[in-house]
């Protein structure tokens, strides 16, 4: 998966898809009560990126639904996976669970349109700290007893993006009521302004491939330097988050990688561990 980074304006969705992305990441900000407000990153952000692009969350989700609904004139088949990078740090601790429930409602009614026939992309609920596991718990439990629980079970995955200890991350999922290998993506990364080694990535990949795994997939962020892309692919990651999807596409076409990797399509399940 080539994951377009910080796609916070509606018009940027097609821009990143045109560059070769098959996945996007969008930042979501909240008020202190846990209500989602804007698609906004703010300062600091990646080098050579505009940090203040934003949309109203409802308007963005509606547009995203159009782009990922077959039969809609705006449909783009390339977009198969959306990462919601949830800026939960400003939510009051005692409102984290309710914030998760409220955002689940926005996904259900603004993105899925309260229907099984809209917004076909898979989604990842990405939270920046394992201390915020109650947000995931609230999101998941919003669907308990719901007619749309099957949508959650089919379409939704999880990620803690704060580079936390992997054993502690496993425990956080247990606290959230999410079982091992239940659609879990593990991210690792840092802003493109600063180099970062692959030590933790290698540990995550080892977990993914072990009999005692809790991780289904591994992705790195934010990567665009040619040598760093090659290093990430040689580490056997499943996804690369980038500001320059065209760079990743170019590397994938090289002799070293063209027979080892392919660009994921909608037919490739993002929750299934890939075995060579």
Swiss-Prot record:
Necessary cofactors: Mg(2+)
GO annotation (BP), single: lipid catabolic process
UniProt protein name: Dermonecrotic toxin LlSicTox-alphaIV1i
Binding site for Mg(2+): 25, 27, 85
Swiss-Prot/TrEMBL keywords: Cytolysis, Dermonecrotic toxin, Disulfide bond, Hemolysis, Lipid degradation, Lipid metabolism, Lyase, Magnesium, Metal-binding, Secreted, Toxin
Cofactor binding comment, as recorded: Binds 1 Mg(2+) ion per subunit.
UniProt family annotation: Belongs to the arthropod phospholipase D family. Class II subfamily.
SUPFAM superfamilies for this protein: PLC-like phosphodiesterases
EC number: 4.6.1.-
Catalytic reaction annotation: an N-(acyl)-sphingosylphosphocholine = an N-(acyl)-sphingosyl-1,3-cyclic phosphate + choline; an N-(acyl)-sphingosylphosphoethanolamine = an N-(acyl)-sphingosyl-1,3-cyclic phosphate + ethanolamine; a 1-acyl-sn-glycero-3-phosphocholine = a 1-acyl-sn-glycero-2,3-cyclic phosphate + choline; a 1-acyl-sn-glycero-3-phosphoethanolamine = a 1-acyl-sn-glycero-2,3-cyclic phosphate + ethanolamine
Major location category of this protein: secreted
Expression tissues: Expressed by the venom gland.
Presence of the UniProt keyword Disulfide bond in the record: yes
